[in-house]
Amino acid sequence: MTSLSRPRVEFISTILQTVLNLGLLCLGLILVVFLGKETVHLADVLFAPEQASKYELVEGLVVYFLYFEFIALIVKYFQSGFHFPLRYFVYIGITAIVRLIIVDHKSPLDVLIYSAAILLLVITLWLCNSKRLKRE
């Protein structure tokens, strides 16, 4: 196998980085549209008189924060020189598990396992923010 010349490798890297950036830009725009739709849905649920709408409102709020966190992750990617900070993924994981507990809380054992997963993610977040591992 022949090795590629340095300019050719940099050209391929630039092309792939551009494709990745365009893809993330499109994903960010799609998430903004979904965030707008979720805002309208939350407004509808807020004024619904049913008791079940309260659970739907809480679930909708957590989904709203998930959209918001993904958009913030994409913004941070562009601001930090095309790098995804690990702690943002941990935040998203914690929020997603909280949503899962809210939606599916029938089995106490499952809730306990989900809570242990949140504890593990919080410990991970603490380690990521420690002085030894902090990069930003």
Swiss-Prot record:
Protein family membership: Belongs to the PsiE family.
UniProt lists the gene as psiE
UniProt-recorded name of the protein: Protein PsiE
**Which residue spans traverse the membrane?**
15-35, 55-75, 82-102, 108-128
So which domain of life are we looking at?
Bacteria
Tell me where it resides.
Cell inner membrane
Entries under PANTHER family matching the protein: PROTEIN PSIE
Its membrane topology is listed as: Multi-pass membrane protein
| Any one GO CC term of the record | plasma membrane
Q: Which GO terms describe its biological process?
A: cellular response to phosphate starvation
* Keyword Transmembrane (UniProt): yes
